[in-house]
């Protein structure tokens, strides 16, 4: 079996394409209901043209559910971000807008560099139009490197 080179292997060869996606106008109540059937995965938020806008993380959900606990502020009083998210009506109100993205043309090595630079264990893969086409988690890359005998 030939080994794949992480410097040249496109990330799209093993990115996850089956991920949760909602539009920015999706009601928060609908998002919570959808979690009961499939678990608490991160949720990609898109605009009307399916362009990537942000992500709803587990921490975003926690902040919205527990504003009085101040999870993010480490105080018993609610943090401002938590209080704001607890009043969220739509996905756009709850999402984290800044998230690491890589182009669909990125290699495994480039994706690892983006993760390391941003100190984040997952990235969203976007096409040339900014549409989210995939998700790559650190464990996906580790599995690839193990299969290829790199680690």
Where are these regions (language model features)?
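Tandem CBS (Cystathionine beta-synthase) repeat/Bateman regulatory domains
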Residues: 1-151
